[in-house]
Each structure stands twice: as C-alpha cells, then as structure tokens.
C-alpha cells in the first residue's frame, strides 16, 4: 500500500488542498482511475485454453458468447482477485462474505463456498475476491472458481437477492462537517485504491478524533492491513482533516466469532496431535 505514501501523491494533495467546505464539494464526481472490464467476444462452441494467467472459458452454444476471466494478485497471498469482464455488483458497490454462513442472500457466493479450500468471498463492482484457507493450493481452487463464475453468469441469476447499496458513507442529516469530509475522502480517494487490491474499507464511526474503520475482502486478513491503516489511510485523513487524531480497525461480532472458532479448532487439533502415540514399536 505504499501507493498512499508516494511523494508525488502528497505533492498533488498539497497543491489541491482546499478549505473544509470546499473540500467536501471538490471530492464529488471523482471516479476510479482504473478499468478492469474485459470485453466478451461473440463466439460459439465450447472448450477452454490457458495462457499468461488469462483463462478463456466458453459458455454453452446457446449463449453464443465467450467469457474471459482474468486473475489479479492482491497484497494478501491468501486472496486472489477474479475479473469476469462483466459487472458483478456495479460501480461503487461491494459485499463481504467472511464465511459460508453469511452467503444466504447470494446464489453465487453459496456456489463459491462449495469449492474446497475457499474461506471467504468478496464482491466488488466488477470483480470477485476469493480468500483461501491456509495450506490450500490455488492450482486446485482456481479452475473450480473459474467454472463456477462462468456457469453462474451464463445462468442469468442475480448475484445478490434483495441487494442493498452501500450506506456507510452516505451523508446523513446529523453528520457534522468533520464526518462529512471523512466520508467523502473515503469514498473518493481511499476506497477506490483499496478496491483495486480486491478489498474494501468501511466507515464504522468517528468519535473523539478517532476514525473507526473495518477492512473487508483481501484486506481483512492481509498481513499489511495495520500498516495500510496507520501509514496510508491515517496519513491521508490527517493531511486533509486536522481533527483526525488516529485510525482504528474494528471487528464486528461475526469476525470475533470466526476468530474464536479458529482458535478453538487449532487448540483441539494441537491436543489431538499431542495424544497421538509416538512412532516406533515396543523394544
């Protein structure tokens, strides 16, 4: 996430620094600078070919088209970004599924969690981020994920049932000027960069100079997530908004439950290994 800290970027920020009220207005309309969409070409037939990290998967003849699914590495080695070349949730929308029990409202997420080794699923505007279990092999997971994504988009089913747009950075009537600026900065400068890495950052609150944020997708379990928050996000917020003293990563109840379950599982596994008889027969 050193992209947050480049001198050129800070110089640009200094040159464009505005008053607090002007700042809120100036952020509106700034869009992502990167386009991941990949065109689909009209074809018939079926089959697949692999080359240079790009997998071509052809839909059934009835669909009369091909889907090109590209993968992109993320800062987290346990997460991989899949770009199907079509909108997943549409511009500005994201949805996080940290485990299979949270996938009840998404037919696509349910199918992806059936792939052995998949630990988490995250949907972005035009990408799907898959987080794998530790020790699982991408060489085994990727082909199945490709097939699931291709078949799903050929089916025409909705990615989400009863989908709700992101509301964490929506400007509310009771938001003061500081909160408004924080939300605008997150939406226009910070969130697009994080989403390029296959994750998202969600505004959870602001109190006493502390901005509370939640990391999602590839960023949620990334080893550098704390560094990203402190050296990247915090620096940018403080540069524009002097009222911000620090940034804090928060975890919701679901995160704590998952962490607790993993700790319990690891403890039981360690106990079982200790109880196993040592190798070698009686002397």
UniProtKB/Swiss-Prot annotation:
[4Fe-4S] cluster binds at residues 219, 222. GO terms for cellular component: mitochondrial matrix; mitochondrion. Signal peptide: none annotated. It is found in: Mitochondrion. Residues 1-65 form a transit peptide. Residues 182-250 are annotated as: NifU. Its main location: mitochondrion. It holds the Pfam family Nfu_N. The keyword Mitochondrion applies. Keywords: Iron, Iron-sulfur, Metal-binding, Mitochondrion, Transit peptide. GO terms for molecular function: 4 iron, 4 sulfur cluster binding; iron ion binding. GO terms for biological process: iron-sulfur cluster assembly; protein maturation. The keyword Ligase does not apply. It comes from the Eukaryota. Disulfide bonds: none annotated. Molecular scaffold for [Fe-S] cluster assembly of mitochondrial iron-sulfur proteins. Belongs to the NifU family. This is NFU1 iron-sulfur cluster scaffold homolog, mitochondrial. It comes from Drosophila melanogaster (Fruit fly). The lineage of its organism: Eukaryota, Metazoa, Ecdysozoa, Arthropoda, Hexapoda.
């Amino acid at each position: 996430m050193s992209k947050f800290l480049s001198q050129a970027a800070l110089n640009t920020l200094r040159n464009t620094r505005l008053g607090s009220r002007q700042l809120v207005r100036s952020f509106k309309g700034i869009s992502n600078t990167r386009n991941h969409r990949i065109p689909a070409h009209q074809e018939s037939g079926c089959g697949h070919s692999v080359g240079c990290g790009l997998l071509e998967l052809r839909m059934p003849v009835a669909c009369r088209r091909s889907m090109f699914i590209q993968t992109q590495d993320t800062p987290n080695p346990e997460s991989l970004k899949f770009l199907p070349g079509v909108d997943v949730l549409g511009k500005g929308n994201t949805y996080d599924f940290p485990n299979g029990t949270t996938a009840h409202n998404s037919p696509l997420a349910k199918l992806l969690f059936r792939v052995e080794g998949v630990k988490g699923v995250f949907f972005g505007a035009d990408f799907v981020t898959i987080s794998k279990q530790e020790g699982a092999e991408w060489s085994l997971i990727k082909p199945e994920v490709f097939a699931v994504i291709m078949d799903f988009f050929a089916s025409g089913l909705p990615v989400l049932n009863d989908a709700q747009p992101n509301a964490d950075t929506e400007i509310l009537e009771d938001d003061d000027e500081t909160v408004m600026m924080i939300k605008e900065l997150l939406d226009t400068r910070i969130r697009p960069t994080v989403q390029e890495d296959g994750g998202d950052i969600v505004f959870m609150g602001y109190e006493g100079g502390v901005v509370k944020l939640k990391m999602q997708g590839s960023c949620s379990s990334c080893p550098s997530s704390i560094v990203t928050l402190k050296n990247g996000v915090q620096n940018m917020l403080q540069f524009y908004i002097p009222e911000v003293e620090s940034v804090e990563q928060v975890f919701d109840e679901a995160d704590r439950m998952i962490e607790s379950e993993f700790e319990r599982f690891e403890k039981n596994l360690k106990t079982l290994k200790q109880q196993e008889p040592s190798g070698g027969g009686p002397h």
